[in-house]
Amino acid sequence: MPDASDADLLDGQALSQAVRDEVKADIQAWTDDHRPPFLSAVLVGDNPASKAYVRGKEKDAAEVGIETETHHLDADTSQSELLDLVHDLNADASVDGILVQLPLPDHVDERTVIDAVDPSKDVDGFHPENLGRLMRGTPRYIPATPYGIMEMLSRSDIDPESMDAVIVGRSNIVGKPLANLLLRRTANATVTVCHSRTKDLAAHTRRADLLVAAAGQAAFIDADMVKEDAVVIDVGINRVDDPSTDRGYRLVGDVDFEGVRPKARRITPVPGGVGLMTRAMLLKNTLKAARLRATSA
């Protein structure tokens, strides 16, 4: 656990544990009258990061009382075979949530697969219907990483109202949905989304009261790009070579943590920050899926 010297850290370990404890209590109450929530994960290939992430999700689910199954398919599985599995899971009344682990192999079109998932079982929140609901302000499932960031801010008493929020990265998984959440009347931030074609990126990041780095580039945001006393959220998780470690690499974020930390009011570490909150919010979405399916049955 962080000590007093880590007061600036947004501790994903402690915050995600609090979420898991709440979900566990909710599931214990739910299962008095219902079966446990059931999550089916689909993993294609042997990407080490994807395999580790799925194992982490399985561990989290077991901790809170969610039952899981993982369909691990060969890397050369055809798109049609993958779609057949997704359709089978859609039709299976015992499955509450479906998670297709990304990225998929190059020969599979991710958008086609995501669109094939039953939106009522799309606990990742990536289906166009669920993204549209989010944009309209009536979300069913919020994508887990933006959801986790908002939960982290809330539980850390960081109110984004009137903040200049700058998001570096415009993906459908993080940047765009997070911008939408920060623009809602419950958040009231002023939002700028930057990307690879943004002119003078540092001019934007230097004015950010809330800076979210989701560019997928190791240590991309340095101290010169950060405003004094900013809140810095690092979504990135990148492997960099490090012969001094047993694994030969270490994990770093999109932010130069050691350089930026002295300037930041609050900052997330990598690992131990946003990634843990992402996993925790997936559990909340899965429980919600079980509740929605029970009420619609």
Swiss-Prot record:
It comes from the Bacteria. GO terms for biological process: L-histidine biosynthetic process; methionine biosynthetic process; purine nucleotide biosynthetic process; tetrahydrofolate interconversion. NADP(+) binds at residues 169-171, 196, 237. Pathway: One-carbon metabolism; tetrahydrofolate interconversion. InterPro entries: Aminoacid_DH-like_N_sf, NAD(P)-bd_dom_sf, THF_DH/CycHdrlase, THF_DH/CycHdrlase_cat_dom, THF_DH/CycHdrlase_CS, THF_DH/CycHdrlase_NAD-bd_dom. GO terms for cellular component: cytosol. Keywords: Amino-acid biosynthesis, Histidine biosynthesis, Hydrolase, Methionine biosynthesis, Multifunctional enzyme, NADP, One-carbon metabolism, Oxidoreductase, Purine biosynthesis. Coiled coil: none annotated. It catalyses: (6R)-5,10-methylene-5,6,7,8-tetrahydrofolate + NADP(+) = (6R)-5,10-methenyltetrahydrofolate + NADPH; (6R)-5,10-methenyltetrahydrofolate + H2O = (6R)-10-formyltetrahydrofolate + H(+). GO terms for molecular function: methenyltetrahydrofolate cyclohydrolase activity; methylenetetrahydrofolate dehydrogenase (NADP+) activity. The keyword Protein transport does not apply. Its EC number is 1.5.1.5, 3.5.4.9. Homodimer. Belongs to the tetrahydrofolate dehydrogenase/cyclohydrolase family. PANTHER family: C-1-TETRAHYDROFOLATE SYNTHASE, CYTOPLASMIC (PTHR48099:SF5), C-1-TETRAHYDROFOLATE SYNTHASE, CYTOPLASMIC-RELATED (PTHR48099). HAMAP family: THF_DHG_CYH. Catalyzes the oxidation of 5,10-methylenetetrahydrofolate to 5,10-methenyltetrahydrofolate and then the hydrolysis of 5,10-methenyltetrahydrofolate to 10-formyltetrahydrofolate. This is Bifunctional protein FolD. It comes from Salinibacter ruber (strain DSM 13855 / M31).
